[in-house]
């Protein structure tokens, strides 16, 4: 078969979707007999699952009984007097955006993603955090929210409030660009070199799509990368012990 298979190109970025997260959540609550209970105003995406596991194993969190997502559970914990909802293992751009859409439809005002990432350019000795201010759109999900462009970005008002507070943390948090990919096992030498050449300092799988959602919908989303390894040299990931300082920063900024 040699014929080209064209991708759909009829994208109207201002048109409303026929399939809405609120409708799915309503049906999930009906089918599963769940209460119509809003989620905390601040919610955290935990792609690696370490934070949720930490809350479960230490008794510092409890399950949210009204979270109606078919694919995930939510743990709720108290951080500096504020309830925070944690959703684990929404890995990759499509899944992360699906869950983020459902979080906002369920009452969230701020969604934070903290994911482990591979270091492309050394900014400090790992482990350290990167506040992702721009993400290279090398994934497919963002194209359903915004017209094609190289980068998607942290909302400007959030960047302006967060950056001044970064200097007060013991754990290094550095503002920098990332490369968002859909295919971690296709990070070839040429692809890595290209990403580095245009300024990406780390590689992860969610930020570009989450920031596209934020821009398209006028939502508050912050993406942090926890730099735990260099490319092709994977170390043990330890996020749970260090997540609290970053979340506290976000809550008080």
Describe each region flagged by the PLM:
Residues 1-112, 118-253:
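Accessory terminal and edge-of-domain segments that mediate assembly/interaction
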């Amino acid at each position: 078969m040699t014929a080209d298979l064209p991708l759909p190109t009829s994208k109207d970025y201002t048109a409303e979707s026929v399939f809405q997260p609120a409708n799915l959540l309503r049906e999930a609550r009906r089918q599963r007999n769940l209460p119509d209970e809003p989620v905390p105003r601040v919610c955290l995406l935990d792609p690696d699952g370490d934070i949720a596991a930490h809350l479960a194993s230490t008794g510092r969190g409890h399950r949210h009984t009204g979270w109606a997502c078919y694919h995930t559970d939510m743990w709720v914990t108290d951080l500096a007097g504020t309830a925070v909802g944690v959703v684990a293992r929404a890995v990759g751009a499509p899944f992360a955006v699906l869950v983020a859409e459902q979080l906002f439809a369920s009452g969230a005002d701020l969604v934070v993603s903290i994911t482990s990432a591979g270091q492309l350019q050394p900014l400090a000795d790992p482990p350290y955090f990167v506040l992702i201010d721009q993400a290279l759109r090398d994934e497919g999900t963002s194209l359903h929210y915004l017209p094609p462009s190289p980068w998607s970005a942290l909302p400007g008002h959030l960047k302006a409030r967060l950056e001044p507070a970064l200097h007060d943390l013991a754990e290094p948090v550095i503002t920098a660009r990332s490369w968002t990919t859909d295919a971690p096992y296709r990070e070839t030498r040429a692809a890595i070199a290209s990403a580095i050449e245009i300024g990406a300092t780390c590689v992860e799988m969610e930020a570009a799509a989450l920031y596209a959602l934020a821009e398209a919908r006028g939502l508050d989303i912050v993406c942090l990368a926890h730099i735990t390894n260099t490319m092709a040299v994977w170390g043990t990931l330890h996020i749970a012990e260090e997540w609290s300082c970053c979340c506290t920063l976000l809550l008080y900024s």
